[in-house]
């Protein structure tokens, strides 16, 4: 299924609702869908959804970026501003042992690629960050996987100080 990712600068004064309305309008124009109900609601776990359920969405923000991914199928989006501080301890605590070994071998340079891949996947599944975050791996001996349990992971090149992944 096609996914549309809309990115906004956080200094953009529009509300989350108006940003989502613009993203849904862009998606609807591109894929010729109708979604007149652009009312944002939240599931008990905090995952946002559109009242009409005609289009799935995922929202993320970090640093100066805010983004929204839209698709007819479940979707997960994560944006991270790269910060070097504390990545080793975070990886040791939250990542799968295979991922931690991979990061040790690569000097933790791919930490944010792995983090955004993992977070986009758990947003895709609707689980969010739970105790199961270390139960799955997004790497093998060759590096970052292109999919996890049949769900495609796609890193989106953008500004060098950010990592963005959609699942």
Model-derived regions: residue spans:
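Core catalytic alpha/beta fold that binds nucleotide/phospho-ligands
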Residues: 1-167
């Amino acid at each position: 299924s096609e996914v549309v990712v809309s990115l906004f600068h956080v200094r953009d004064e529009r509300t989350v609702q108006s940003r989502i309305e613009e993203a849904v309008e862009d998606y609807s124009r591109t894929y010729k869908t109708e979604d007149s109900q652009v009312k944002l609601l939240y599931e008990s776990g905090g995952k946002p959804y559109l009242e009409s359920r005609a289009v799935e969405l995922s929202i993320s923000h970090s640093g100066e970026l805010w983004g929204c991914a839209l698709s007819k199928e479940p979707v997960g989006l994560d944006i991270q501003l790269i910060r070097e501080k504390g990545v080793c301890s975070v990886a040791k605590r939250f990542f799968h042992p295979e991922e931690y070994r991979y990061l040790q071998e690569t000097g933790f340079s791919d930490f944010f690629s792995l983090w955004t891949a993992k977070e986009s996947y758990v947003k895709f599944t609707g689980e969010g960050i739970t105790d199961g975050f270390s139960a799955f791996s997004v790497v093998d001996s060759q590096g970052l996987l292109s999919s996890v349990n049949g769900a495609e992971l796609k890193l989106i090149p953008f500004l060098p100080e950010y990592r963005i992944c959609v699942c």
